[in-house]
Amino acid sequence: MAIKKSQLYSSLWQSCDELRGGMDASQYKDYVLTLLFMKYVSDKQDSLIEVPEGGSFADMVALKGDKEIGDKINKIIGRLAEANDLKGVIDQADFNDETKLGSGKDMQDRLSKLVAIFDQLDLGANRADGDDLLGDAYEYLMRHF
């Protein structure tokens, strides 16, 4: 079933709630949009973006609760970026940054919750032509932060 914008916006807001306190609100978009992009390309599996082995959102889901989740998320994003000539584009947010995401169990819990939020979304369902999910998400975040 196609995702409703209200469901997308609710998930975006929920993910921002998880990030509160560790960083300036203007930086939320870096993390939220990166995860949304990873989820989107993993769900869509179209020919424009290659999702390499070890570079999918499902690989992130498998990390929930892992002590090294931040570093491993960075590596997963790096694999997708490298496979698609997107280095320096989608790999800017550091998911292992203790000053922004906390350390130890705090980081582990925060990132596990973030991944779980996006895991609930089905972005692969058919939508009407011209529906720009990523653009809508970006505009939503810009309006609120």
Pin down the residues of each PLM region.
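Non-catalytic, mostly N-terminal accessory regions of nucleic-acid modification and defense proteins
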Residues: 1-145
